[in-house]
Amino acid sequence: MSYIPFPDISPELFSIELFGVTFALRWYALAYIAGLLIGWRLVLRMIRAERLWSFGPPMTEDQLERLLTWVILGVILGGRLGFVLFYQPAHYLAHPLDILKVWEGGMSFHGGFLGVMTALVAFCLKERISILPVADLLAAATPPGLFLGRIANFINAELWGRPTTLPWGVAFPGEAAQSCPGIEGICARHPSQIYEAGLEGILLFAVLSLLVWRRGWLHWPGSVSGMFLAGYGATRFLVEFVRQPDAQFVSAGNPLGLAWQISGYGLTMGQILSLPMILLGLYLILRSRRTA
């Protein structure tokens, strides 16, 4: 069976030791930082492009600077709490201090999304500015960060896919990745992180950029946010078919790791969380067109 060996890339860019304590900069942390900075620059560019707006941009550059702090808190707190509540509530209920161990991994996109939305609504109410136009700005600027995050997932050899015999399957390192019932020897898996990087990162960014800069969708508040939600939800729903489910959902009687099922058919947790995003996204698109 042909497969692609996992590249020899350290998850750490570099590490230094100060006063007996080792500090390391990981690719994952760099992806978060770079994603936020790129997103900020993209939003700033859209704010400055007056032709994109019917009645001017929804906020000033100074307000954008303040919003960035709120977004950072929403991403970190929401992403962590989402993982705790959606994927391993029993573990963290028994070991509450483990919630603080973010360096051990465990972030949820859906939780981060809810955290950012909560921060966005609170910020807009405080600043007395319209919510949907600001949400459109953030939606159009989010995919580059998603792309970088998925590449970091690949480098960390985490969130890999289900076993496959396809020639582009990757032999991820580690006992968990190589534990494939019924497969002898090297176990190759779908590089689902790369699939997601291409779909929710590159493809979604291309679509949203076209709608913003060529089709003028920022003139219809909520339309860009709706396309982001529907696009991300749909791509995540599809990738879940080849993505390895979280270990806590997998058992001898549930080898596919379905979080909800009837007669052997069902949905993974990622698919369950993505369906409301798709429905809300379609609603926002239709609403924006009816009120245009």
Swiss-Prot record:
GO terms for molecular function: phosphatidylglycerol-prolipoprotein diacylglyceryl transferase activity. Pathway: Protein modification; lipoprotein biosynthesis (diacylglyceryl transfer). It holds the Pfam family LGT. It is an enzyme of class 2 (transferase). A 1,2-diacyl-sn-glycero-3-phospho-(1'-sn-glycerol) binds at residue 150. It comes from the Bacteria. This is Phosphatidylglycerol--prolipoprotein diacylglyceryl transferase. The lineage of its organism: Bacteria, Pseudomonadati, Pseudomonadota, Alphaproteobacteria, Rhodobacterales.
